[in-house]
C-alpha cells in the first residue's frame, strides 16, 4: 500500500465509543476562537469561498477555470486531508427581513414600502429560491500541538486562498463562531435565527459549545437517521463512470433540500505514486509474460493477449504517463452526501431523485447501510473522514467534480435588481460599494430600460434619504416621481421655469479653481450653439477670458449673492475688442436675448425636493442638447451642496447618447462622470442607441470603465460591439439575444450575471413604473 495513504488511514483510526448523549455524536473535542478545531489527534480549519460563473462561461473560459481548479488540487499539501463541501441551506427568513426589507418610516411612502416588501417576500418564499448555497474548503492535519497546527494552516490556507482568488472566488477564513453556526444551521434546521454563542461565557460557566449546536435527539437506523424532527440519509458515490460531465455535482446539489455534499481528498506525493504505478505495471507485465509462456508451452504461438490483461496494461501505462508527463497527481477521494427531509416518504423520494441524477451520469450513488453516523460526520465541514470507500483518481478526474456553478450578487445593504436566471436567487447589489458606482442601462426599445431605472429609483426613494435627479426627454417619469412625492420641472422655450446656466455652488470644482471647470462647461455650451468642431482657438481663448471676468466678483464674495447669467456673459463678449468675440456673441444671441433664452435668466425653480425630474420633452431640437448640459451642470451644483451635507445623490440621464454628439459636451459629461464618484454620487445613463454611443471614443471609455451595467435585449450589431468591449462570452450573449421584457445581463464589479425581473403587475408601484400602453389602458 502507498505509504502516505497508510499513514493517513492510521492517523484517522479512532477508538470505537458508543455515544451516551446527543452531544457525543458531534466528534469535535476542543475548539479555539480563531476557528481551529481538534478531534482525535487531528486539527482542522475552514475557508468559505464564493461561487464563480462556471455554468455560463465560454468554452475557453471554462477550460481556464478547469485548469485553475486543477492547479489548486495539485497544490494541496500531502501532509493533510482536504474536504471540499457544498452546503445547501434554507434562507434565514429573519436575517433576510432584517437586511433586505424596508422598515416603515411613518410617512406617505409606507404604502409603497409595504407593496415592495410583499413583492420581495413573494420571490423568496417561492420554493425555487428559498435555498442558498455556501462552499467551504476544510483542511485537516495530524499535529502534536495547536501551535504546530497554526503554523501549518497559516501556510496552507494562504496558498488555497491565493489560488481561489485567481479563479475570481472570494474567500474568508471562518472563526469558531462561524464554523459552529454552519453546524448549528444544519443540526437545527429552521432555528437559524436562534443561534447565539459566547465562547467566554461558555468557559466561565463550564458549558459545552455542543449544547448550543446539537439537535434535540438523534436516532440512527440502517439506512437513515432522525435528527430532531427531520429525517436524513447519508450516501456515497460508489461507482464512477469512465467519463463524467463537469455538471454532475451541480445537478446533485440543485435539489431544493437542506443538504451537505463533501469531496474528501488525500493527495499522494508524486514519487510514491510513480513508484506504485511502476510496481503495478511490472505486475501486469509479469502476468502477461506468464500467460504467454503458458500458451507457448501448449504450442499456441499466435494467441492474442486476453482483453482484460491488455486493458489493465493500457490503463496502467496511461496512469503512469499522466503522472510523469502530464503534470497530474494521484489522489484518493470519496464523495459523501447527506440530505434532510420533513418525512420518511419525502426522504425516500429525494433519495430516488438523487440516485437518478447519478445514474444519468452512469454513476452509482448508494446509501451507507449501518454507517449513517459515520456518513453524517464525514459530510459535515468538520474535517473528519470515517468512510473508507476511497477511489484512486488523477487531478483531471477529480477536477471534473466541479464545485462551481453561478456567481451570485448579494451585497449587504443593497437593493433588488431581479433574480439570477441560473440559481433563481435574488440579485441584491449596492453600487456604492463598487470602485466606481456609475453605470449604464442599455437595450432596444421595449426591452425594459426605463422600467429598470424606475425600479431602482423606487427602491432608493423607499429605502434611503438620498437625492434622486432625473433628466427625462420623453415625459416618462412624471407618474412615478409625483407618486413618490417628488417634483417634476418642465423646461421648454415657452415655460416659465428657468435654470441659470451659470449658477455656481460654493465648492464647485473639487477645491480647484471653480472658474476652470465652468469655462469648460461654457465652451461646451458655445459649441452647441455654433456647431460641433467649429470653435477656433481664438474663440476658445475669448470664451475662457470672459468666463473669468464674469465670475470675478462672484467668486471673490464666496459664491454668495446673485450669480451671473448668460446675458451677462453675452454682454461681456460684446465688450471684447476682437471680432471673433462678436461672432460668438452673435451665435449665442438666440440663447441669451432671443426666443430660446430659457437658460439665460436667474433660476426660479424650487430645487428643495429630494426627488426631482426635469421634463425636457418640449425643449425642441435646438435646445435639447444644451438643455441637458445646463441641467447636468445644475446637478453638479446640487452634488457639491450634498457633499457638504453628507448626502448621497443619484443621477439618471435618459437618451444619454445626445450628449456624445458634441466633443465638448461629451468631455464635460466625462469630467462629471469622474468627479461625482468622489462626491458620493452615482450617474446612470440610459440609451437604446448603443451603436451611436459607441461611435464616441469618450463614450466607449466610460462604458468600459463603468462597474455597473444592465444589458437588456440588444440588436445584433450592438451585441457584437458589447461582446468585444466587455469580453462577454457567446453563452452570456444568449441572455441578451431575443429575450423578453426585463431579462438580460447585469454586470456588477467583476461579476456578470444573467437576470430576470417579473415585477407583479397588480401593484400600485407597477402602475407608476410601467410605460406600456396596454398596462396604462388597463
Where are these regions (language model features)?
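Conserved P-loop NTPase
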Residues: 726-778
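Conserved lysine of the Walker
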Residues: 449
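A short helix-turn-beta junction within AAA+ P-loop NTPase domains corresponding to the substrate/partner-engaging
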Residues: 485-489, 698-711
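P-loop NTPase motor domains
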Residues: 52, 59-78, 89, 253, ...
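Post-Walker A helix-loop "phosphate-sensing" segment adjacent to the P-loop in P-loop NTPases
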Residues: 459-469, 637
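Hydrophobic positions on the alpha1 helix immediately C-terminal to the Walker A/P-loop
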Residues: 452
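Extended, folded cores of ATP/NTP-driven motor/assembly subunits in large transport
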Residues: 1-406
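Hydrophobic anchor at the beta1->P-loop junction of P-loop NTPases
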Residues: 441
Amino acid at each position: 500500500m502507498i505509504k502516505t495513504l497508510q499513514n493517513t488511514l492510521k492517523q484517522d483510526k479512532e477508538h470505537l465509543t458508543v455515544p451516551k448523549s446527543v452531544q457525543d455524536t458531534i466528534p469535535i473535542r476542543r475548539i479555539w476562537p480563531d476557528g481551529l478545531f481538534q478531534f482525535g489527534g487531528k486539527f482542522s480549519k475552514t475557508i468559505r469561498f464564493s461561487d464563480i460563473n462556471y455554468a455560463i462561461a465560454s468554452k475557453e473560459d471554462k477550460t481556464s477555470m478547469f485548469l485553475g481548479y486543477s492547479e489548486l488540487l495539485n497544490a494541496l499539501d500531502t501532509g493533510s486531508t482536504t474536504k471540499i463541501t457544498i452546503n445547501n441551506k434554507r434562507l434565514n427568513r429573519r436575517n433576510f427581513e432584517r437586511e433586505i426589507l424596508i422598515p416603515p418610516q411613518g410617512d406617505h411612502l409606507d404604502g409603497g414600502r409595504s407593496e415592495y416588501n410583499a413583492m420581495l417576500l413573494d420571490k423568496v418564499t417561492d420554493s425555487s429560491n428559498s435555498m442558498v448555497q455556501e462552499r467551504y474548503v476544510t483542511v485537516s492535519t495530524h499535529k502534536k500541538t495547536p501551535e504546530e497546527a497554526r503554523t501549518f494552516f497559516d501556510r496552507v490556507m494562504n496558498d488555497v486562498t491565493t489560488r481561489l482568488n485567481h479563479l475570481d472566488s472570494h474567500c474568508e477564513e471562518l472563526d469558531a463562531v462561524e464554523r459552529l453556526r454552519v453546524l448549528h444551521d444544519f443540526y437545527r434546521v429552521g432555528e437559524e435565527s436562534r443561534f447565539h454563542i459566547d465562547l467566554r461565557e461558555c468557559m466561565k460557566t463550564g458549558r459545552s459549545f455542543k449544547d448550543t449546536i446539537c439537535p434535540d435527539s438523534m436516532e440512527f437506523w440502517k439506512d437513515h437517521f432522525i435528527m430532531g424532527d427531520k429525517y436524513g440519509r447519508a450516501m456515497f458515490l460508489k461507482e464512477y463512470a469512465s467519463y463524467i460531465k463537469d455538471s454532475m455535482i451541480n445537478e446533485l446539489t440543485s435539489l431544493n433540500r437542506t443538504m451537505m455534499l463533501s469531496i474528501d481528498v488525500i493527495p499522494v506525493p508524486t514519487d510514491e505514486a510513480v513508484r506504485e504505478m511502476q510496481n503495478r505495471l511490472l505486475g501486469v507485465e509479469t502476468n502477461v509474460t506468464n500467460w504467454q509462456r503458458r500458451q507457448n508451452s501448449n504450442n499456441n504461438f499466435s494467441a492474442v493477449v486476453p482483453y482484460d490483461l491488455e486493458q489493465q496494461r493500457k490503463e496502467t501505462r496511461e496512469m503512469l504517463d499522466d503522472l510523469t508527463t502530464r503534470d497530474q497527481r494521484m489522489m484518493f477521494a470519496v464523495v459523501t452526501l447527506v440530505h434532510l427531509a420533513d418525512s420518511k416518504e419525502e426522504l425516500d423520494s429525494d433519495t430516488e431523485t438523487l440516485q437518478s441524477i447519478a445514474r444519468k451520469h452512469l454513476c452509482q450513488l448508494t446509501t451507507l447501510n449501518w454507517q449513517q453516523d459515520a456518513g453524517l460526520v464525514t459530510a459535515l465541514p468538520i474535517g473528519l473522514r470515517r468512510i473508507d470507500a476511497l477511489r484512486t483518481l488523477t487531478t483531471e478526474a477529480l477536477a471534473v467534480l466541479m464545485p462551481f456553478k453561478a456567481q451570485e450578487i448579494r451585497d449587504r445593504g443593497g437593493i433588488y435588481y431581479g433574480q439570477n436566471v441560473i440559481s433563481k436567487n435574488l440579485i441584491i447589489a449596492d453600487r456604492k460599494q463598487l470602485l466606481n458606482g456609475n453605470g449604464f442601462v442599455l437595450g432596444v426599445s421595449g426591452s425594459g430600460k426605463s422600467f429598470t431605472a424606475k425600479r431602482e429609483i423606487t427602491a432608493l426613494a423607499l429605502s434611503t434619504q438620498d437625492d434622486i435627479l432625473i433628466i427625462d426627454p420623453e415625459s416618462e417619469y412624471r407618474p412615478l416621481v409625483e407618486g413618490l412625492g417628488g417634483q417634476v420641472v418642465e423646461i421648454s422655450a415657452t415655460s416659465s421655469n428657468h435654470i441659470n446656466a451659470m449658477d455656481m455652488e460654493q465648492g464647485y470644482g473639487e477645491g480647484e479653481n471653480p472658474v476652470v471647470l465652468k469655462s469648460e462647461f461654457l465652451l461646451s455650451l458655445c459649441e452647441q450653439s455654433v456647431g460641433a468642431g467649429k470653435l477656433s482657438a481664438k474663440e476658445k481663448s475669448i470664451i475662457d477670458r470672459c468666463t473669468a471676468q464674469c465670475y470675478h466678483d462672484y467668486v471673490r464674495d464666496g459664491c454668495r449673492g446673485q450669480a451671473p447669467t448668460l446675458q451677462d456673459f453675452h454682454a461681456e463678449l460684446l465688450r471684447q475688442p476682437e471680432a471673433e468675440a462678436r461672432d460668438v456673441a452673435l451665435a449665442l444671441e438666440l440663447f441669451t436675448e432671443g426666443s430660446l433664452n430659457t437658460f439665460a435668466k436667474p433660476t426660479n425653480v424650487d430645487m428643495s425636493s429630494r426627488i426631482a425630474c426635469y421634463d425636457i420633452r418640449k425643449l425642441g431640437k435646438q435646445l435639447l442638447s444644451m438643455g441637458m448640459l445646463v441641467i447636468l451642470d445644475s446637478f453638479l451644483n446640487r452634488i457639491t451642496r450634498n457633499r457638504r451635507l453628507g448626502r448621497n445623490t443619484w443621477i439618471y440621464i435618459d437618451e444619454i447618447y445626445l450628449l456624445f454628439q458634441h466633443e465638448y459636451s461629451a468631455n464635460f459629461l466625462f469630467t462629471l462622470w469622474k468627479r461625482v464618484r468622489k462626491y458620493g454620487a452615482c450617474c446612470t445613463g440610459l440609451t437604446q442607441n448603443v451603436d451611436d454611443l459607441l461611435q464616441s471614443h469618450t463614450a466607449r471609455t466610460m462604458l468600459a470603465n463603468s462597474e455597473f451595467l444592465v444589458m437588456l435585449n440588444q440588436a445584433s450589431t450592438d451585441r457584437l460591439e458589447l461582446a468585444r468591449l466587455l469580453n462577454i462570452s457567446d453563452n452570456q450573449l444568449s441572455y441578451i439575444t431575443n429575450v423578453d421584457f426585463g431579462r438580460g445581463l447585469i454586470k456588477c464589479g467583476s461579476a456578470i450575471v444573467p437576470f430576470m425581473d417579473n415585477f407583479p403587475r397588480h401593484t400600485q408601484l407597477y402602475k407608476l413604473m410601467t410605460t406600456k400602453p396596454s398596462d396604462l389602458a388597463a
